[in-house]
Amino acid sequence: MGGTSVCSSAGKQTLAPSGAPRDRGSPPTAQTGRTREPAPRVLRSVSVVSLMTAVSRVLGLVREIAMAYFFGTSALKSAFDLAFIVPNLFRRLFGEGALSSAFIPVFSESLVKEGRESALRFAVRVISLLVMVLGVVTLLGILLTWPLERLLPPDSRWLIPLPMLRIMLPYALLICVAALLSGMLNTFGRFAISSLTPFLLNLIWIVTLCVACPLLRGLPEKQIIVLSWAILAAGLAQVLFQLPALASEGFRFKLRFRALLSDSKVRRVLALMAPAALGIGVIQINVCLDKLLAFWADPAAPAALEYAERIVYLPLGMFGTAFMTVLLPTFSRQAAAGDTALMRETLERAIRNLAVIMAPCSAALLVLALPVISLIYNFKGGRFDETSAMLSARALTAYAPGLLVFSLQKALTPVFYGLQDLKTPVRVSMVGLVLNVTMNVSSVIGLPHGWKHVGIAGSTVITSLINGIMLAVLLRRRGDFLRAAGFAGAVVRAMLCAAAMAVAALSVYMLCQRLLGRGGDGL
């Protein structure tokens, strides 16, 4: 579930190292000796990522609109969401998560201290190791689905996701490679290409739905299988899309499986990755448990949660994820240069900006949950009916207050990763896991039918809030981070913006109801 300034300190513009392409987004190198990030560069990078991510998120919302039209909150849609969680888990763990969090700081440091050629050789070794490990895991996962089918009762709802899972598991390997390639491009300052990569998944997804579903009308099981194959093709497309840009940076995609662990930097990445994998694994276990418990409580619940999440992810991806994408390599370079003061300044400005942006978004979604859901998903002739709208709106109401929490957490976590401290987020995540599981189970047992998934969504928000507070306190103890001076004003401004947005949103909604009558309910 990112113009305002992000960093105000300006540094000197220097030439790229000899023999390397001059790139306005290139990272600092040993030859340049640059130690400070120019403020316009970080802001420009965030703007680029925000724009490209916005395009991808809008397409992601369009794809969910299409999914709602063809599948509604059916058990088949929920089963598809469950199957897609598995490759996404690997993506967040090995691609955008633990491996990237460990790889990008070491890759950035190698660029600074050893030069481009050495850094690219190191990257090839890491990608080769990833392909080898995930290739084996993917194969074993596919083989495991057949015994599971024989063990489950013939009428079990848990049989529905298995055929889709078999098809989509290799997507985990492809998307993890694509995520590492994106991390390299971000380190080179090529944010536009990496930010556009998810665009391909959404585009292929939408085209497949618009073509396959009408052709296979009345055959939803076949429709969903065709879509599963399309997602696998999208994973390959995301890898191929980034290769030309990396080739211009001197990278050659050639796997090498010999002596992978002989490189000290590879071993260092694995050492850094271990605690991060545990921490991110805990987070992903939370995500999986949310959907599994929701599916167990009500076959329609995972689909309702997904529709609500998609709306929340639109502003979260545009701003929160955009900031995190830019901040991780930025903090890594600043930490490698030993510039803690600039890290602090960058973080504080990012948090202030996110608070002012996200608070109004949370307020608007909170007060207009049902109208927003109805406007976006409830089209005549589709399978998304009033019950689907009600279930999804309840989930959105629970998720909306967490929008600010989710985005601020995305700003705090990269600081620890940039400092190559991956253990602290792990400890925090472990506390969150216990809390989230406890609240999830309590929600499923204690809440009435139709509200169980709301408790699950609320548990996610509360857990994220506690995790964010713990990260902030621990970061504060590390040094002069998160100074209180100046934040009181930012909090007041954020709350005023949220209140103004809530009043404006309700006023517009009431005006539309008065002008359009009952038709205003669809707004």
For each feature predicted by the language model, list its residue ranges.
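Membrane-embedded alpha-helical bundles of multi-pass transporters/translocases
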Residues: G2-L523
